[in-house]
């Protein structure tokens, strides 16, 4: 999938999960009137879970073991509660910006083999209730799973970088700014900081 230009919700804010197992390329995209956005190269399936009193809760399960997300030099931006990038590998070569000013607003990059479960009941205006739950896979790799290229910049209230493949690493040649919250990096491989 190639995403270029504006993506807008006409009407109330909504959450979006966009999936393509063959890969996703974003270059010059702006997301407007979304609550949370997830881009993933995983395979989707729906799962209904019985709750108390006969209530059924639906989850979108995403199983990721292939594919790459690439953010091009014209970048990606949005005013979002959450931005989730989920792929076997992620490369950022331009500005990646979450403009929402809350300290809980985040960009989370999850690279490697993983399973994610999205709660479809999560409100697109609620930044306190979790939207997605992750479970790492069992894969091993010595590759660079997440690369932030020279001249690129990742900006959000919080930035979370998670590499699930054992031995896979992170290489940052750009700039990362967690402007209002915290910065988290989890990887068992090499972490190279050059920016």
Predicted features by range, described:
Residues 1-195:
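Extracellular and secretory-pathway beta-repeat/beta-biased strand scaffolds
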């Amino acid at each position: 999938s190639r995403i270029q230009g504006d993506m807008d919700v006409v009407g109330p804010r909504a959450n979006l999960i966009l999936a393509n197992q063959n890969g996703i390329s974003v270059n010059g995209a702006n997301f407007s009137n979304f609550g949370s956005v997830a881009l993933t190269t995983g395979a989707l399936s729906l799962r209904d879970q019985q709750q108390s009193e006969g209530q059924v809760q639906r989850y979108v399960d995403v199983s990721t073991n292939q594919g790459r997300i690439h953010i091009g030099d014209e970048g990606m931006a949005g005013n979002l509660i959450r931005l989730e990038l989920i792929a076997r590998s992620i490369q950022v070569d331009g500005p990646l910006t979450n403009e929402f000013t809350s300290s809980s607003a985040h960009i989370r990059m999850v690279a490697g083999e993983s399973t994610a479960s999205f709660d479809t009941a999560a409100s697109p205006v609620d930044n306190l209730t979790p939207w997605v739950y992750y479970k790492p896979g069992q894969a091993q790799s010595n590759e660079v799973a997440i690369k932030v290229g020279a001249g690129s910049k990742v900006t959000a209230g919080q930035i979370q970088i998670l590499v699930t493949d054992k031995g896979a690493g992170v290489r940052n040649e750009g700039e990362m700014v967690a402007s209002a919250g915290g910065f988290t990096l989890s990887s068992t491989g090499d972490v190279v900081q050059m920016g």
